[in-house]
Amino acid sequence: MERSNRKTRIGRVVSNKMDKTIVVAVETKVRHPLYGKIMNRTTKFKAHDENNTANINDKVLIMETRPLSKQKRWRLVEVVEKAK
C-alpha cells in the first residue's frame, strides 16, 4: 500500500498526559492578507503514540491516518529530536 500521498507535519509535543496519545503543536508562518506582516500560527493535533515514546518538548514527525477516535486523525512516525 502506497503511503507517500499522506500529509506529514513536524511539531513539538505539548502534552503526553493521555495514554497512547500526544498533543503536537505545529507552527506555520502566514502572511497577513492586508498588512503583509508574517505571523506564527499554531495548530494542535492529537496524535496516536502506540508505545508512549514521546515526551514534552520533543520534536516529532506525525502522519495523517484513518480516524482513530473522535479527535485523533494523526499518528506518530518518529521522534526527530529529544528534548534537552
Curated annotation (Swiss-Prot):
Entries under InterPro entries matching the protein: NA-bd_OB-fold (IPR012340), Ribosomal_uS17 (IPR000266), Ribosomal_uS17_bact/chlr (IPR019984)
GO terms assigned for molecular function: rRNA binding; structural constituent of ribosome
Keywords: Ribonucleoprotein, Ribosomal protein, RNA-binding, rRNA-binding
GO CC aspect terms: cytosolic small ribosomal subunit
SUPFAM superfamilies: Nucleic acid-binding proteins (SSF50249)
Superkingdom of origin organism: Bacteria
Pfam families hit by this protein: Ribosomal_S17 (PF00366)
Gene Ontology BP annotations: translation
UniProt cross-references to PANTHER family, sorted A to Z: 40S RIBOSOMAL PROTEIN S11 FAMILY MEMBER, SMALL RIBOSOMAL SUBUNIT PROTEIN US17M
Function field: One of the primary rRNA binding proteins, it binds specifically to the 5'-end of 16S ribosomal RNA.
Similarity comment: family membership: Belongs to the universal ribosomal protein uS17 family.
Subunit field text: Part of the 30S ribosomal subunit.
NCBIfam families registered for this protein in UniProt: PRK05610.1, uS17_bact
Protein name: Small ribosomal subunit protein uS17
Species assigned in the record: Clostridium botulinum (strain 657 / Type Ba4)
Native organism taxonomy: Bacteria, Bacillati, Bacillota, Clostridia, Eubacteriales
